[in-house]
């Protein structure tokens, strides 16, 4: 077994795992009840995917017309695939059905397999702006507070503001601002 610590390969060649935790990393640790031969394999630190949307089909590259009837199962499968690929933490930066929150809570409770999820819920966007179909539209600070309130009520881990347009939403451009700097500053102050 090769062990990569994020900077270099280290001389240790054994990992002792108890339950879900790494108990020890060393050289030729004693063989326990269950040993797995990892010859030719490399262990790395868990990867972080900083921008996912578990609600979206990664193969479509377009906004959904309506939620898929099997969306919870599809999201669970996507989360499982992430873990199998070495992703141990992911930030879900937008959805409209709140199902990523249920999945996050099930993963945290040990009921589902998936990475640690940090969820933002409905991103704050301008009316008709990027990802408006997720329900986070706000044209002023009063409307932005309403979106923020929904996020807090759902225990959002972070708040996402669509400062510019994006490629997913027709008529929206990543180079065009959606909000004034003053409104963004107000939203950030309230979110803190």
What do these predicted regions represent?
Residues 102, 143-192:
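Histidine/acidic residue-rich metal-binding segments in metalloenzymes
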């Amino acid at each position: 077994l090769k062990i990569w610590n994020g900077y270099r390969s280290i001389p240790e060649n054994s990992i002792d795992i108890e339950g879900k935790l790494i108990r020890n990393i060393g050289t030729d640790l004693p063989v326990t009840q269950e040993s797995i031969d990892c010859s030719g394999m490399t262990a790395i630190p868990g990867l972080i995917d900083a921008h996912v949307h578990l609600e979206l089909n990664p193969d479509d590259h377009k906004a959904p017309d309506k939620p898929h009837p099997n969306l919870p199962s599809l999201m669970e499968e996507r989360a499982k695939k992430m873990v199998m690929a070495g992703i141990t933490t992911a930030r879900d930066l937008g959805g409209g059905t709140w199902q990523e929150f249920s999945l996050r809570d099930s993963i945290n409770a040990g009921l589902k397999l998936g990475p640690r999820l940090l969820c933002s819920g409905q991103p704050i966007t301008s009316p008709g702006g990027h990802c408006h179909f997720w329900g986070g539209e706000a044209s002023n600070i009063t409307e932005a507070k309403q979106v923020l309130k929904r996020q807090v009520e759902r225990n959002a881990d972070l708040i996402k503001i669509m400062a510019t347009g994006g490629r997913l939403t027709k008529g929206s451009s990543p180079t065009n601002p959606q909000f004034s700097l003053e409104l963004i500053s107000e939203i950030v102050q309230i979110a803190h």
